């Protein structure tokens, strides 16, 4: 048995960890710490947070040699080994370790050593000397008070742990125990509403997939803070971060925008229990946590999940059809406004996620396409195409259900290209042209044609960038809006340019990311958005800005905005209702 004992030192943000194991022969043990965490596809080099490390065997100091950035070899000596190390933990995220006097959290991958060749041995986790009053929330199987045990290392690191003062909201979905564990500081909110809405989302997803569910219990670890957002999936739980203002207030009718975003996060990470934690690329079966695990299939595992996360909010009726279409229009608009969609394919976006998407820079809108956003639109088109071509006999639901049955039977990952093959086998349709176009070219998807089959009309309009897309209205501006051609962050006394968009007004004026605009037409730039809202296409703005501490001046002529704002109109409410219900 391998034992991991953790002791917190909250004020220093240190986890003091002891790895204990028996070495039965005179051979070195090889210890490895993960370089990345499943579900977050970039190298994070967790070993850099190790502050000190030493070893002893049979109670005596023993040699421990580092042989790579995340690898250590013990001396070739049989006996009872203890490797003691300290890890700095101050990463406020869902994928690492965090420790203060108020709260602790960790994803086991970033703290716990694996012993090479012994991944399938029983692992015990012990939490010692926790601060008084701290509670523990995790789906790790408990064998005692703050003592947990798993059958393998892979299972050990797939149950994040939340520590501190925790509020719990429990419910059942399809007879399975579920719990929302809330941490952080947050205002009073409608607890019954949150519990009820999340329960409906879970029940809708459980009803979509065949039994048995991939978990016997499920835990949402929800940490609330200020302007934070994110989620990471695990086999029977998920770690979530959300803004404290996103909790449903008392008396709320239709879910507001912030609450809808929170419910979408719950939905997205829960869906991953089937799509990526169960059904997964062969490249992830098993995960190699030493190096990048490249696959062209992230569009199917993240993009399809991103399609269903909001769709299932509508299907479970926690948001209205109109609010769902507003979310869909915003997603279409985000994709349309990124010129990267014309340069990078979905397959390339998936494969290069490790060093491009997760390391996006100021040129990202011009060079990259998101396998989340574009992938969700490919899933939308695929779903509606299957429904139409099969006369309603099949849908993307059918494909996802059968892929899960496949996994229940084989427990194997999906090889490159196999997802597309199985989709066609399951539906009996020839979808080869769609997959070739959608995955391996930058040709636009014919979404307008596709959405008509669901009773929706898609129209693009040249609206200001402040309009992110939504439900259409009867009247549109008579002339296209002007477009500044840059993204910016407004500060108290200047606007900081963050992205310059190819072919736009700002690029033509030779502005650069990082420029600080201090004046427009000789007036202080305290509200650039307001200045642009009052301008018209063809207006020339005199811009004064700082670049690397040097004052510059340029003239910027506002070009016409592209028709890239998506507006959706309901033309057949019956068709729309049947699609959202999954019965079209």
Identify what each model region corresponds to.
Residues 1, 14-18, 28, 80-82, ...:
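Intrinsic-disorder/low-complexity, polar/charged segments enriched in Ser/Thr/Lys/Arg/Asp/Glu/Gln
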Residues 1-35:
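Early extracytoplasmic/domain-onset interaction patches
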Residues 22, 56, 128, 544-546:
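A generic structural motif
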Residues 38-45, 134-135, 519:
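Short aromatic-acidic-glycine turn motif
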Residues 45-52, 56, 60-200, 204-215, ...:
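Non-catalytic architectural context of zinc metalloproteases
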Residues 169-298:
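Juxtacatalytic substrate-recognition/specificity segment
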Residues 238-245, 278-279, 290-341, 550:
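Post-HExxH zinc-binding segment in Zn-dependent metallohydrolases
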Residues 309, 319-584:
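C-terminal recognition in membrane/secretory proteostasis and scaffolding
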